[in-house]
């Protein structure tokens, strides 16, 4: 494998379905073999569009579960640059300010890039760049309870705002966009991010692709 090639694995599914956990598990276990600088994780959330030109009242009304809320074109460009051996500056997104921050995070080319995000499989151009894709098929009620706990504890949200957002956009957009994108996944993973067999299958697939 030359320095200008990389394997891109996408992990999609509902918010709080276990994407981050399985991505972290694969990252932690593969970096021992590949080296920390040879594997990286990119969160689709980093590519939410800049909303600094909007007031806070306008920002909170954005439908963050719709594909248009994300700059997939920039993500595609960054992945193409990484595959060609060039470093990129990944945006940083603030969940409390509902917009991008001024700083970015530099990512250098990697042998393995793990993408994780709710809407990754909805974009045909993104799918073309993936070497393998996964859909976390976790029941929506479990995802909601996890999301409620996480957003209140970690993202400065109120319980009322999380419930309201779930009713207005999260659940409807899951049914309209996210769940239908499951048809494009190579692997469908039940039981969340602690599914050890699914994790091992993914690791084996990555190792096979690296050996080509």
UniProtKB/Swiss-Prot annotation:
GO molecular function: ATP binding; cytidine kinase activity; uridine kinase activity
Transferase in keyword set: yes
Principal subcellular localisation of the protein: cytoplasm
Pfam family name, one: PRK
Binding site for ATP: 13-20
Top-level taxon of the source organism: Bacteria
NCBIfam families attached to this UniProt entry: PRK05480.1, udk
HAMAP family for this protein: Uridine_kinase
Official protein name in the record: Uridine kinase
